[in-house]
Amino acid sequence: MLDEAAYFLLGNIKIYYYGLHNALGALAAVIVLALCCRARRMPAGTAPLYAVLAMPLGVACSRVLFCLLDGRFRGIFSLRAMLCFWGGGHSMVGALLGAALAAVIAAKILAVPARRMLDMMVPALLMFIAFARVGEQYTEMLGRSRALVSEVWRQGWLVAGDEYALYLKTYVLEALCALILAAALLPGLLRGGRDGDTLLSAMLLLGCTQVLWESLRFDAHMRESFVSLQMLLYAVMFAAALLVFACRYARRLRHGWPVWLALGVIALTAGGVIGLEFMIDRSGVSRFVLYAPYVLLLALPAVCGFVFKKRSNLA
């Protein structure tokens, strides 16, 4: 971890609180996965096998994606620098990609449908995200917003400060959001609906909400100018889920208008968000005013996606 991250000593070993939260999150994820697998009567040993695959793949993909996309890392880019993963510098989207790859491999080994295995990992990964976000409070830069200028934010449990300014604790919002999404998606998973629906629903909801949280974050993590690169990756996530739901509905109708509507919604959302991001970063307009249409824009693909999902699943 970085030098400014908080740690404690266990003998002569430095234990970083952020790393400890990630480890606890991984343990919680395995426990949640094991319980879900038991409820859905998955093959014995599914959770341990997935854990063995997901942990190294998650770390590797997280590190590689960060090294490829972080502007600050490019100045020291080398294989040796990439391998120093314990010094900090990871991408949450990369970790999720590694976890998804592990689910596909585990499904092949266990001879179960890949989409079902991908569904099973969703609550577990959301639990991991919650722990990881809470751990960001023990770093100096991660998980906080731009400096707050409004007097409304002078006090409150969502506000933290230093000698320079006050900041919004975005890590709290992200952790709560992950837990809420896990609670919302778990009943559908346990009911045993259509394979892949839980994954796609998670991609849609997590993608839309994380675009908002990445906009609020201002920690220079994987940023280019006024845009967070992880925000773009989360946008691809919700766009992909929306298009899959639209294609399903189009096949059921035997007509292509849902796909064209989905593409229009994606274009409108992307254009609107980029414009609002520019104004948030460069203009003096109140952020309260700017984030109202921001939330409405991100709600549009989520609503469309779930309408398509519901209608495509009708008998």
Locate predicted features:
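A feature for loop-to-transmembrane-helix boundaries and adjacent hydrophobic helices
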Residues: 1-315
